[in-house]
Amino acid sequence: MKKEFTGIVAGLLLATVSGVSFAENDPLVGKWKTIDDRTSYSRADVEIRKKPDGTYEGIIVETRNIPGAEKMNICHQCPGQLKNKPFIGLPFIWGFKQDPKNPLQFVQGSVLDPIGGKVYKGKARLSANGKRLTLRGYVGVSVIGRSVTWIKY
């Protein structure tokens, strides 16, 4: 009985350590500084996590003022259950899957514009060094959309 218990504990520890190691080696996981493509100011920090189903989501963890503009704290324009939720903790991107043909690309995601409240289809591409993420939100086909680049902390 003691051997079985020791084996179970060892297995759980190994699984936990393996999961932590995997997350540390996953270049998309971590904290990112968003850069507004229109003003070039950093508006927020987003924490990207890998979910148990293998998809990625990003949660807003910090917001900043743009000089001369009022700081927004609540997502008044967001749809559905996200309406009137605070920006901090708000799911901002979700459903992204790593492209099996290109591990630096992530596809089939959704992107929330927390200012306008619209949800767009999304795709993302990591730089070769894993320090920059180009995120594209679009309607229909990716030609009709806009891209932003984030910087990893």
Q: What are the roles of these predicted feature ranges?
A:
Residues M1-V9:
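Bacterial N-terminal signal peptides that target proteins for export
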Residues S21-N25:
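Boundary at the C-terminal end of the N-terminal hydrophobic targeting segment
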Residues D26-S42, R146-Y153:
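K/E-rich alpha-helical interaction surfaces of small helical-bundle regulatory domains
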Residues K31, T55, G130-R132:
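Structural motif
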Residues T34-G122:
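Central antiparallel beta-sheet cores of small beta-barrel/beta-sandwich binding domains
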Residues G130-R132, Y138-Y153:
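Edge beta-strand at a domain terminus
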